[in-house]
């Protein structure tokens, strides 16, 4: 029952992808391939990164600091609502949260995939098997083993669900 630091901070990562990530991973791989350091890939939509200062962050919405939201329920709610409102790929803003001695910068969401891009993702030769590092049965896989994806996203605003944070509010099929 407490607010944890951003996974970006606790993991020590230079860059994190949020959302479904297919487009972001290609953009990042291409940048790395031409020699751009991960810590300098600050321009890809659908990513988050650490910044020591805001000199290279131009337009953004500031939310209350981690320290404040972890100790003030009203500040937490306000920060969540700002994050929720900015999940639209077309109008969503870059979010900045002070976090200790620096800032967590969350770029605006990535655009939804086109129909052809989405078809290409689901045409990949998935095995429907767990990663080889798992040696024991994973009960949660039984439920989805033979599932079909008919669409992504959800326009609902259910209080108990975070699907829009993962797949967005735009229905893609």
At which residue positions do the language-model features occur?
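Radical SAM [4Fe-4S] cluster-binding motif and immediate context
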Residues: 85-173
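Glycine-rich beta-alpha loop elements in corrinoid/cobalamin-binding modules
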Residues: 1-100, 104-107
């Amino acid at each position: 029952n407490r607010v944890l630091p951003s996974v970006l901070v606790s993991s020590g990562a230079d860059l994190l992808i949020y959302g479904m990530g297919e487009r972001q991973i290609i953009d990042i791989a291409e940048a790395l391939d031409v020699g751009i350091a991960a810590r300098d890939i600050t321009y890809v939509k659908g990513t988050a990164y650490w910044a020591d200062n805001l000199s290279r962050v131009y337009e953004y919405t500031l939310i209350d600091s981690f320290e404040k939201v972890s100790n003030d329920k009203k500040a937490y709610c306000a920060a969540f609502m700002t994050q929720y409102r900015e999940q639209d790929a077309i109008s969503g803003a870059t979010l900045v949260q002070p976090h200790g001695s620096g800032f967590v910068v969350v770029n605006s969401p990535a655009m939804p995939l086109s129909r052809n891009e989405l078809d290409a993702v689901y045409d990949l030769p998935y095995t429907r098997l767990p990663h080889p590092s798992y040696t024991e049965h994973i009960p949660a896989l039984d439920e989805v083993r033979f599932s079909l994806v008919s669409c992504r996203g959800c326009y609902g605003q259910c209080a108990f669900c975070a699907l829009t944070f993962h797949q967005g509010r735009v229905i893609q099929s």
